[in-house]
Amino acid sequence: MITPKVLSGFKDRLPKDAIQKAQLLAKVSVVFQSFGFVPIETPHLEYAQTLLPDTSSDIQKEIYRFKDHGDRDVALRFDLTVPLARFVSLHHQILGMPFKRYAIGNVFRGERAQKGRYREFTQCDFDFIGSESLVCDAEIIQVIIASLKALDLEDFCVSINHRKILNGICEYFRISQVNEALRIVDKLEKIGLDGVEEELKKECDLNSNTIKELLEMVQIKQNDLSHAEFFEKIAYLKDYNENLKKGIQDLERLYQLLGDLQISQNLYKIDFSIARGLGYYTGIVYETTLNEMKSLGSVCSGGRYDHLTKNFSKENLQGVGASIGIDRLIVALSEMQLLDERSTQAKVLIACMHEEYFSYANRLAESLRQSGIFSEVYPEAQKIKKPFSYANHRGHEFVAVIGEEEFKSETLSLKNMHSGMQLNCLSFLKALEIIGENDEDL
């Protein structure tokens, strides 16, 4: 006999969990659509050569890669952005530019499993392809904020940086292994200052003084300074080199655009330590954390990638986008008690006291559904205790009971499972009115 078990880093999703996830995805999908983003789908499995170019060594170690039955070198996608580059390169003449897309799907990374981190997890991506305008970057941040607010989250911060600033810092310190250095800096939250310092010494051959000054610079943060105060504070960096100058100027323009959108300044701050470990980012980058649950890591991250399609097409297409980590958000929202705890999406359970009442019960359930109320019929004529126990376990808000009197008069008795109050022999219209009201009204 096979012992039923799940691989580490993977999980089954029970009805309550699956319902919660579906509700969150529905909410963010509405936000994406409200900004004009359209859905696409790409395969879970790609040619390995599609996924590997410009991918950091850390990510490459986490990719699930193998030979398929045709002896082809294939891999499971580790994000939805690289498949997007392949997709756009293949279909750009049909799509037209600029192109705004969102995609929701599972991705796979063989990283160490821990709280909020899985080896299979769902990403919700939204991207703006085919424009280099910073208006697109501002809109992506606007969508991040709107999406989190749609999930009833208010206390969060989008930490923003620019890869040109990081490149400029590396240029200032004459670091030749730029991508390697930034990959290590990106691990600051994970391994701490000492860990980053040790890796920089080992991998980039930097001396202690250079590392100390480098880490001081990449830890520059806006914190409680106003936008104007912070840009005044870092103005001197523009004189160091063109990369730093261009990066800071882009952030100044971005902040002007976000200010025009009247987004609260508490929701976004500059943080020079934000690097994003994926090698394809070239411009503004960002990570979003919940202020009360920073240990969970970023719940939404992304940035600009101006050369992503270079591996697939002679026509270079710019892009900017972000990805919402829905599984991490579920962990956070659960701890905050902001999730629906029911194991059913049906609001009403209809219970029959006798077999001959099922035809009426089914008609009643269909009438409720046509009125927009999800309903189900308990499949057995039982003593009332059993369907009530079922409703309690699943989380139905109401139980409609069909007994002899209700059957003959074509009415129903209705019990509110939250308040415990019951009304007998209601007409369908009266029951419909009550079910549509708040539970407390019964």
From Swiss-Prot:
Reaction catalysis annotation: tRNA(His) + L-histidine + ATP = L-histidyl-tRNA(His) + AMP + diphosphate + H(+)
CC terms in the record's Gene Ontology section: cytoplasm
Protein name, per record: Histidine--tRNA ligase
Subunit architecture: Homodimer.
Localization: Cytoplasm
E.C. numbers: 6.1.1.21
Protein family: Belongs to the class-II aminoacyl-tRNA synthetase family.
Gene3D superfamilies to which the protein is assigned, alphabetical: Anticodon-binding domain, Bira Bifunctional Protein, Domain 2
Segments passing through the bilayer: none
InterPro entries: aa-tRNA-synth_II, aa-tRNA-synth_II/BPL/LPL, Anticodon-bd, Anticodon-bd_dom_sf, His-tRNA-ligase, HisRS-like_core, HisRS/HisZ, HisRS_anticodon
PANTHER family reported for this sequence: HISTIDINE--TRNA LIGASE, HISTIDYL-TRNA SYNTHETASE
Cross-referenced Pfam families: HGTP_anticodon, tRNA-synt_His
GO MF annotation terms: ATP binding; histidine-tRNA ligase activity
Main location: cytoplasm
Top-level taxon: Bacteria
Organism for this UniProt entry: Helicobacter pylori (strain P12)
BP term (GO), one: histidyl-tRNA aminoacylation
Keyword list, A-Z: Aminoacyl-tRNA synthetase, ATP-binding, Cytoplasm, Ligase, Nucleotide-binding, Protein biosynthesis
